[in-house]
Amino acid sequence: MLLERLHKRLHAGSSRRSQENKDKNCKPEDALPIQPEAQHQTQDPQPLLNCDYDDMIAFDRNLSTPVFTPVMTPINNSSSNQAKSSDASYFPPYLNANRTRQNSASSLASSVSDFAQNFKQHTFYNNNAQFTSFTPQFVGLLLEVYQNTCSDPTITPFDTTNPPSGILNRVAKAAIQQSELQQLDIGCDRNSWLLTLVRQRLLQEVRKDGYLSRNTSLTSLPPPPPPQFSEMLRVPSPFVNADITDPIPLSNTNSNPNVSSTTSLTNTLNWYSLQRSNVSMKNRNGSSQYISELQPQPILARTNSNNSVSNSNAFSLLTPTPTTDSAFNFNIALLSRQRSNIISSPLASTRLPTANVSTEESSILPNESLKLKRDLLRLKR
């Protein structure tokens, strides 16, 4: 009995120990093994390629610097044969190569451009002291050669106020050759720039001549100022004068005018001549006239005539009368025209006598007509 009890106790103890050992040694199937954490290596930032973040492919999370795969490969245009054009330029590529020639002043014709050469040469002309050191004798010779060239019938007609470069070159060469033959002093050294300087000086002189001839023509003169302005400026107006005398001698050519009338005539006729200078004027054929004083011209004086058929115009006979005043101006014709309009008015026709004039009284007639004209002018004012 005792042996059986001992055996049961031993068997129960051993079974308990074996069960405990089984429980300790058993492992669950679902449990995963614990792995150590991965150690990340830090690296410097690397430049990205030309791509967008939306176009990237997934990368490995274990890497700190992912590798990007661009969808589009960049194209290198540096080896292309086309010229590089700016973003603001709208010209085609084949025109950009010639834009330097198109934008230059030398590509324009001489009738369009104010400068015959490019900007560098134009700056050289302005900065060079020899450009303005030509002697007046050489400048006169240059203009004379130019006038002879303009009057040459074998040359194709051109604008004389803006000649082309071929004419400038021809005239400059001829002027330099003539100055050498005549041993004329030019005023500057004879070097490689001489022909260019002479061409530029000729172009300046021709354009200045055309400008002065346009501004000094009779049609470009300003209109006469009003009487109040002429009194303020103390300028004798040719149309308004309190003590006006007839500047047109109505008597015979042998009669001498008074000193006072001559003085008033000179002041009246010099009203416009003070504004004019002695310049070279050019006509359409290219010939120039150096006008120092306007030549005297015959004046048409109006005298009374005996006309029994027509009494509408009492002063209808025109007789040319020479004048000796060298400062003749077109104001004389304007004065005579105004007087003729006043005399031909209805008021003048009622006041003028229509009696027959004999040969003996012809010498007295001009004095009476002067008085009548003065009265009519005072009434007209």
Curated annotation (Swiss-Prot):
Upper taxonomic lineage: Eukaryota, Fungi, Dikarya, Ascomycota, Saccharomycotina
Modifications after synthesis and translation? Phosphorylated during S phase in a CDC28-dependent manner. Phosphorylated at Thr-65 and Thr-73 by HOG1 under osmotic stress. The phosphorylations of Thr-65 and Thr-73 are necessary for CIP1-induced growth inhibition.
List, alphabetically, the GO terms of the cellular component aspect: cytoplasm; nucleus
What residue spans carry the Basic and acidic residues bias annotation?
A: 17-30
Name of the protein described by the UniProt record: Cyclin-dependent kinase inhibitor CIP1
Biased amino acid composition, Basic residues = 1-11
Induction info reads:
Cell cycle-regulated gene mainly expressed at G1 by the transcription factor MCM1. Expression is induced upon stress. Expression also depends on transcription factors on MSN2 and MSN4.
Q: Where in the cell is it found?
A: Cytoplasm; Nucleus
Give the main localization category.
Answer: cytoplasm
> What disulfide bonds does the UniProt entry report for this chain?
none
What keywords appear on the UniProt entry?
Cell cycle, Cytoplasm, Nucleus, Phosphoprotein
Instruction: Name the job this protein performs.
Output: Acts as an inhibitor of the CDC28/CLN2 cyclin-dependent kinase complex. Stabilizes the CDC28 inhibitor SIC1. Negatively regulates the G1/S phase transition. Contributes to osmostress-induced transitory G1 delay.
User: Which residues does the record list as Phosphothreonine (modified residue)?
Assistant: T65, T69, T73
User: What subunit structure does UniProt give?
Assistant: Interact with the CDC28/CLN2 complex.
One GO BP annotation here? G1/S transition of mitotic cell cycle
Question: What if the gene is knocked out?
Answer: Accelerates the G1/S phase transition.
Report residue spans for region: Disordered. Answer: 1-30
One of the record's GO molecular function terms? cyclin-dependent protein serine/threonine kinase inhibitor activity
